[in-house]
């Protein structure tokens, strides 16, 4: 479930950019075309992707969410006959349900398979036969329709539409709030891929946060009477990224973004430039120190407690990803404070800013 604004974005990602007509666009071949034993459905590290997706990856079971009791309650509150067939739900939980039949190479549409291969990698008609050929470069495959998930900006955009914003009506009906975190969520996934580049870590975290702020800004700018569930997370996200203004001369500052309309393009520029940035351990260290020093703000009783709580939930995830690259002895030294910070940030109604400030100050002294 997502905002109606992002529904079109998700469909574009699924069907393929520039798809003006199904006949001219690459078509879907279906996950079975990827799952033969000689391809991604076999055994061993090079051929076990389908097995991992089917048995370990929650994306293969996203459709199941639509047929449980909670979804039935949400659908009833929204006066939707069936969550399993409504595009307000299937766009993210069963993407192929909303794709026209003409976009398929054969009768393979299986909404119940959830988020499958081509949902992320793009329609495979034009590249499936050539993507293993040694004389075809990665660029060649991308030109044929393979989504360039090696690029962090592209990767973030492929995920954020279904992992960040939810329309207010859905939230009011009981849909949980979403918080997009590209690096942490990617690391927590059962890996069906091999990595050779800088695709995880602080750089991925920053790109993901900038893309998340862009999406929240776009949603907020469209709402005539946005409630706290939209404004508070947006303000916390903007606050977090503003702490990194000036981290590198190639990155734009967000200090002047006074509202959602201004933050939207600024956040997108930040995401694009961060994805191209040559990241370093020094940048990680600087970002970590800047965010840790916000303990003085959490000690400020003039800042509303709920505002502090929203900041804290974003901050602890940032600290988690920025400390992940540290060596084991350094990370072990910080672990008690990190655990306490996470525990303190868990409950919005009971958030205690003064305790959070003390724990954050303790962590700051150990950096």
Model-flagged regions — what are they?
Residues 8-18:
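Bacterial N-terminal signal peptides
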Residues 24-38:
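Local sequence-structure signature of Cys/Sec-based thiol-disulfide redox active-site neighborhoods
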Residues 69-101:
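Long, well-ordered hydrophobic secondary-structure segments characteristic of membrane-embedded
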Residues 328-367:
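Charge-dense, extended regions
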């Amino acid at each position: 479930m997502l905002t109606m604004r992002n529904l079109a974005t998700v469909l574009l990602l699924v069907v393929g950019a520039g798809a003006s007509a199904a006949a001219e666009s690459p078509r879907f071949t279906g996950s079975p075309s990827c799952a033969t034993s000689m391809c991604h459905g076999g055994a061993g590290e090079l051929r076990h992707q389908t097995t991992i997706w089917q048995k370990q990856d929650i994306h293969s079971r996203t459709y199941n969410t639509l047929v449980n009791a909670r979804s039935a309650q949400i659908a009833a509150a929204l006066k939707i006959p069936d969550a399993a067939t409504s595009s307000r739900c299937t766009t993210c939980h069963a993407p192929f349900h909303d794709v026209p039949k003409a976009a398929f190479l054969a009768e393979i549409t299986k909404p119940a398979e959830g988020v499958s291969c081509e949902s992320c990698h793009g329609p495979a008609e034009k590249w499936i036969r050539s993507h293993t050929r040694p004389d075809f470069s990665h660029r060649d495959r991308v030109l044929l329709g393979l989504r360039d998930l090696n690029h962090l900006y592209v990767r973030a955009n492929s995920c954020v539409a279904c992992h960040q914003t939810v329309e207010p009506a859905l939230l009011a009906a009981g849909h949980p709030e979403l918080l997009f975190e590209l690096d942490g969520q990617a690391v927590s996934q059962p890996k069906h891929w091999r990595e050779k580049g800088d695709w995880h870590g602080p750089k991925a975290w920053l790109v993901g946060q900038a893309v998340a702020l862009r999406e929240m800004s776009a949603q907020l700018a469209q709402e005539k009477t946005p409630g706290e569930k939209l404004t508070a997370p947006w303000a916390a996200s903007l606050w977090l990224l503003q702490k990194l203004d000036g981290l590198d001369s190639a990155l734009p500052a967000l200090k002047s973004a006074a509202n959602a309309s201004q933050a939207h393009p600024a956040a997108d520029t930040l995401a694009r430039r961060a994805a191209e940035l040559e990241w370093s351990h020094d940048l990680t260290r600087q970002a970590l120190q800047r965010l840790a020093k916000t303990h003085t703000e959490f000690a400020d009783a003039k800042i509303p407690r709920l505002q502090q709580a929203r900041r804290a939930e974003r901050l602890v995830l940032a600290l988690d990803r920025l400390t992940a690259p540290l060596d084991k002895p350094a990370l072990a030294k910080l672990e008690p404070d990190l655990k306490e910070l996470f525990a303190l940030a868990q409950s919005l109604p009971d958030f205690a800013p003064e305790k959070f400030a003390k724990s954050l100050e303790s962590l700051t002294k150990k950096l």
